[in-house]
Amino acid sequence: MSWDQVWIDINIATMDPSMNEAYGAITDAALAVKDGKIAWLGKRSDLPEFDVLATPVHRGHGGWLTPGLIDAHTHLVFAGNRANEFELRLQGASYEEIARAGGGIVSTVKACRDADEAELFDLARRRLNALAKEGVTTVEIKSGYGLDLDTELKLLRVARELGQHHHVDVVTTFLGAHAVPPEFKTLGEAGTDAYVDLVVNEMLPAVVAENLADAADVFCENIAFNLEQTERVLSAAKTLGLDIKLHAEQLSNLGGSELAARLGAKSVDHIEYLDEAGVKAIAQSGTCAVLLPGAFYFLRETKLPPIDLLRQYQVPMVLASDFNPGSSPICSTLLMLNMGCTLFRLTPEEALAGVTRNAARALGRDQRVGVLREGMEADFCLWRISTPAELAYSYGVNPLVDVVKGGRLIHQ
């Protein structure tokens, strides 16, 4: 056998659902890489003969390989911060009250409109580096802090550039319909409709013309866009060839998840107020449920997502950081594993699936990454742990040892 590298003295959490063992585990295992792909994996005792002198052999010292982690929902590119709003919330103000008073998303818009691409790139690269140090190898980055054509394009260009200058794969999402900008908000519902016209008729075509986005998203909520407005944006995005997803049922239940299911969305995100009808709908459409415990924690929410219903209807559950300056300024995927278990009562295996296999599905990357099996990309992490559950159990001491991305050893 001729391979580019071989890993031995390892255990593997393949996260392959076709395997009967928890985590799709293979103990006392080995793995071989060729041309950036996994060429072989299995029990070390079954490892085919290969040229030991010509092949780099890496010893895992009894650690565990997992798929590279995936953060499937972030707002990584922004300027400024909202520490003042943090203080207001601690004094009793709600997220909605702050937003209606001109804070929230809109307060970040000015900072992003004023910042140039170099400043935004430098800020975002630091955040991406922080995720990468925790084993993240794929990340989704949304726009949504421009709310005008030029700034939305600027944010997406920065996100695309990050992916070109970093080993982490970047999936970009256009979120022009994140909030109603101040210049339209004073006109009431007519202003919101006029802004949706701008998103549909000018922003989306420009984004697609520059190939700046892989998907489009909308914040469907009573403080943002109603169902009709949401459908206009998502339908237009679909027509232009973009994947679609939706912020839905975070603060109330408007039926956004059922709309997302009808339109074939990749995911619905937040979903604290999702009901059984919505769960049934996304189960039938194959739409993923993206859970965002960082926002739940930071906003001190009490309404839990319907985890038992999602399990009952076998909806793929994704865990993501929702890293953003207002509701989840928490740049840590490993912490999301712990929060997913402690706050949402996921099992450690469900949590790990939420940042590997299911996250890949939510981003349309499940034929490439998220599971370790022959033919998939060689995209994995080596951890100094005795069981995969440790990744969710303990936080603060990073157990990451190595990262392989596309067959290339990144971190030692």
From Swiss-Prot:
Cofactor binding: number and manner: Binds 1 zinc or iron ion per subunit.
Pfam family for this entry, one: Amidohydro_1
UniProt binding sites for Zn(2+): H73, H75, H247, D322
Subcellular location, principal: cytoplasm
Residues reported in the UniProt entry to bind N-formimidoyl-L-glutamate: Y145, N324, G326
Subcellular location: Cytoplasm
Single GO MF descriptor: zinc ion binding
Binding site for Fe(3+): H73, H75, H247, D322
EC number(s) given by UniProt: 3.5.2.7
UniProt catalytic activity: 4-imidazolone-5-propanoate + H2O = N-formimidoyl-L-glutamate
Pathway named in the protein's UniProt entry: Amino-acid degradation; L-histidine degradation into L-glutamate; N-formimidoyl-L-glutamate from L-histidine: step 3/3
GO terms, biological process: L-histidine catabolic process to glutamate and formamide; L-histidine catabolic process to glutamate and formate
Keywords: Cytoplasm, Histidine metabolism, Hydrolase, Iron, Metal-binding, Zinc
Cellular component terms per the entry's GO annotation: cytoplasm
Cofactors, names only: Zn(2+); Fe(3+)
Coiled-coil annotated spans: none
Domain of life: Bacteria
InterPro entries attached to this UniProt entry: Amidohydro-rel, HutI, Metal-dep_hydrolase_composite, Metal_Hydrolase
Binding residues annotated for 4-imidazolone-5-propanoate, in chain numbering: R82, Y145, H178, Q250, S327
Gene3D superfamilies linked: Metal-dependent hydrolases (3.20.20.140), Urease, subunit C, domain 1 (2.30.40.10)
Family: Belongs to the metallo-dependent hydrolases superfamily. HutI family.
Alphabetical list of HAMAP family matching this protein: HutI
Role summary: Catalyzes the hydrolytic cleavage of the carbon-nitrogen bond in imidazolone-5-propanoate to yield N-formimidoyl-L-glutamate. It is the third step in the universal histidine degradation pathway.
Name listed for the protein in its UniProt record: Imidazolonepropionase
